Amino acid sequence: MSVRVIITEHARKRLRDYRQDKVTVNDIISAASSIPGKIPTATRFRGFFSKSGRVFDIVAKDLPTGRLVITVIGK
């Protein structure tokens, strides 16, 4: 089952910051899609790796229309 991933403008804007350097939209979609189950409230998920090797966290929540990625936090 594939989940629709919605990335907020805030999260897209943060990708341009230094701490999120080399984290791509595809990395975020892959990370959000890999989380099993339902996320009823905004929750931080830690320890994802981008293709470039950068470690990052995401804050996500499930909506009726898909999985909303609220922000990205680079390490």
Predicted features, each with a name:
Residues M1-K75:
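Ribonuclease/tRNase effector modules and their secretory precursors
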